[in-house]
Amino acid sequence: MFIFGGKCFLPQDLTASSGNFKRGVFMALRKVVVIAGPTASGKSQLAVDVARSCRGVVVNADSMQVYPDTPVLSAIPSAAERGGIEHCLYGVFPSSKNGTVVEWLVLAAGEIRRIWSEGKLPVVCGGTGLYIDNLINGTTPIPEAEPEVRHKVAEAAAAEGIPALHARLSTVDAVTADRLNPNDSTRVKRALEVFYQTGVPLSVWHRRPMVQKLPEAEFVTLKILPPMAELDERCARRFDKMMAAGALDEVRRLKDMKLPASLPAMKALGVPELLDFLKGNRSLEEAVGLAKLHTRQYAKRQRTWFRNKLKADVVLDACYQGAENIIFDVKKRL
């Protein structure tokens, strides 16, 4: 991709015969824009604006938006919000599945290479730091546990409780156990699955060399780090809009699916709280208030992670609400 006169051109828009130009075309088609930031910070709109300006395709990097049954609560961009721009990897895993970062990476690498092959720009957008970090920096090739191993661990969790499994983990992988919350069911079970499957502690796997899924990619990274006061207000306002858009009906349908509470889709922001209301355990006002609180807390954790962990070429210090200078800054780096 090339910039001339403030406009964005793709290689097929130009003609030249030199070998240097052809190599430049090859490298240009290996660019990937990554847009990261906390929930409600304007990532999706920025991704659409970049994609529209640079003939791009938006690739989802949000671990809740990979599930199809909570489009309102997980803020999957609507047709109107997409504005005619192609989006991919939204709703790709059934809600009955525990999609892994490795599975997402395989899909993302395939989509990014497809987008390159079409002469377009991949615009990866999301708030899941693990997805983005593994895409940019590579991942440890930890084998997935076989179904019988996962079943064994799940049975033990149901019979003994997660704190007991955490105690068991400490006997085989003290390093991992020390860094995990004893009540973090997903990570405690995953660490035990890895050990039972491979005989090697997860902490040892993490010390092994990283493997790049896209070694040929050159990333242009943007992160949005708005003040928490601005983010808090936007989180609360957006949840009110979600309620008006049918979030409660969405959770009611999810409840009818009778999925295990341990699945990621059942942990989306707002789902546990509204489920409590539907079960008669709290008032709707209490459920909404708690969901807003948890959303703000999650946004704060995301903001902290991206501030400390993600190196970026462009940093926005306010929520994105449209700005031509930001788009131009991105173009200069392509």
Label each PLM-derived region with a short phrase.
Residues 2-4, 9, 14, 19-334:
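Phosphate/pyrophosphate-binding catalytic cores of soluble transferases and nucleic-acid-acting enzymes
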